[in-house]
């Protein structure tokens, strides 16, 4: 079994691909992989580090305004297709999957034109430009949100969920809580703003820290390494309550997510896949700085089902943060209802579901 994977630029496109590869390796240790990305994307360091053969092509995304850069992009696309065809013929894959980001455009397009089974995986509720373009040529389009399906040819759409969801399952939540200093007997909320943190969330948290000290639940706050020193400087002045733990970063996020009762976070596709797979209630603060405002639309998909509350960044203050947390953590019935709603949305076997679709394509 030979599988070619392409996707990159951001972690949101790369980590689902790696989760899928790990799942396939568990089931088929003999499977061979080739990953095609760009040299300037995150994938050029993450993928080789994971022990997966990596090749690069030169490609860039379209600018939304008419510009000379777009002419160069078209030329790079044509060259990218030629280079991709060369790699594809050499590797001879049974199936090709693109997980988003402009790099997978020429790769998946080239594979489709060579008659190789192809599939794209769309993580967000609003598809990216590349996946919308590729949906005309591929055999299948795998989605994680029902809202994404309407943007693609219906005959090609399959709901698989995000392979990252599979990687947070079967973790030891008690071990996770202990590792960060949380009590096993108290309710707890985890607050974080993504891998690099988020200043508006930091500001609201710092403003609320004294009031958190009066609560009968515990708070674990992940600042992001960039913001840690600044946050701690303010916290030292205000005082750090015993029930509030502050960390720059944690390496065992799946364990900690499993252990806590409530999560406050951005609304990236990977985060939502993990939260729903675990049945975790959440307060989502979508980043307003992303393409097509897709985080707000991601959040709406699970807020509408009762699994989360949404707090827009423009409305985020110490008061609104505290109010939303109290409303869920201090009401056992609300907490329970949201847990059930999240669990019903989760697709914990997403990696296997996606692989099943790929296997069907290989048989054709």
Curated annotation (Swiss-Prot):
Pathway given in the UniProt record: Cell wall biogenesis; peptidoglycan biosynthesis
Keywords assigned by UniProt, alphabetized: Cell cycle, Cell division, Cell membrane, Cell shape, Cell wall biogenesis/degradation, Glycosyltransferase, Membrane, Peptidoglycan synthesis, Transferase
CDD domains: GT28_MurG
Source taxon at top rank: Bacteria
Catalytic reactions of this protein: di-trans,octa-cis-undecaprenyl diphospho-N-acetyl-alpha-D-muramoyl-L-alanyl-D-glutamyl-meso-2,6-diaminopimeloyl-D-alanyl-D-alanine + UDP-N-acetyl-alpha-D-glucosamine = di-trans,octa-cis-undecaprenyl diphospho-[N-acetyl-alpha-D-glucosaminyl-(1->4)]-N-acetyl-alpha-D-muramoyl-L-alanyl-D-glutamyl-meso-2,6-diaminopimeloyl-D-alanyl-D-alanine + UDP + H(+)
Recorded topology in the membrane: Peripheral membrane protein
NCBIfam families listed in its UniProt record: murG
Family: Belongs to the glycosyltransferase 28 family. MurG subfamily.
Role this protein plays: Cell wall formation. Catalyzes the transfer of a GlcNAc subunit on undecaprenyl-pyrophosphoryl-MurNAc-pentapeptide (lipid intermediate I) to form undecaprenyl-pyrophosphoryl-MurNAc-(pentapeptide)GlcNAc (lipid intermediate II).
Protein name: UDP-N-acetylglucosamine--N-acetylmuramyl-(pentapeptide) pyrophosphoryl-undecaprenol N-acetylglucosamine transferase
Species this chain originates from: Bacillus cytotoxicus (strain DSM 22905 / CIP 110041 / 391-98 / NVH 391-98)
Name of encoding gene: murG
């Amino acid at each position: 079994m030979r599988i070619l994977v392409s996707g990159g630029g951001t972690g949101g496109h790369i980590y689902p691909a790696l989760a899928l590869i790990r799942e396939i390796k568990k089931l088929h240790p003999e499977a061979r992989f080739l990953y095609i990305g760009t040299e300037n994307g995150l994938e050029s360091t993450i993928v080789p580090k994971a022990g997966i053969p990596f090749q690069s092509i030169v490609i860039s995304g379209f600018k939304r305004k008419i510009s000379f850069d777009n002419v160069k992009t078209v030329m790079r696309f044509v060259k990218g297709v030629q280079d991709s065809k060369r790699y594809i013929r050499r590797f001879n894959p049974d199936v090709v999957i693109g997980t988003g980001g402009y790099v997978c455009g020429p790769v998946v397009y080239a594979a489709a034109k060579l008659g190789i089974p192809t599939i794209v995986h769309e993580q967000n509720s609003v598809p990216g430009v590349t996946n919308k373009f590729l949906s005309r040529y591929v055999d299948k389009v795998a989605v994680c949100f029902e809202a994404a399906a309407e943007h693609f040819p219906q005959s090609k759409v399959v709901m698989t969920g995000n392979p990252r969801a599979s990687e947070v399952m079967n973790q030891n939540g008690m071990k996770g809580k202990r590792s960060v200093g949380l009590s096993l007997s108290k309710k707890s909320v985890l607050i974080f703003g993504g891998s690099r943190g988020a200043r508006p969330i930091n500001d609201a948290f710092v403003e609320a820290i004294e009031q958190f000290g009066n609560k009968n639940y515990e708070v674990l706050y992940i600042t992001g390494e960039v913001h840690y020193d600044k946050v701690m400087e303010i916290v030292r002045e205000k005082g750090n309550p015993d029930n509030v733990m502050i960390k720059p970063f944690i390496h065992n996020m799946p364990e900690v997510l499993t252990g806590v009762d409530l999560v406050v976070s951005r609304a990236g596709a990977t985060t939502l896949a993990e939260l729903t797979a675990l049945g975790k209630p959440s307060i989502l603060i979508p980043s307003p700085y992303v393409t097509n405002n897709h985080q707000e639309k991601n959040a709406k998909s699970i807020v509408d089902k009762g699994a989360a509350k949404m707090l827009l960044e423009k409305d985020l203050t110490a008061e609104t943060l505290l109010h939303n947390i109290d409303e869920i953590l201090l009401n056992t019935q609300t907490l329970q209802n949201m847990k059930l709603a999240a669990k019903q949305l989760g697709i914990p076997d997403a990696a296997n579901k996606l692989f099943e679709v790929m296997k069907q394509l290989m048989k054709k």
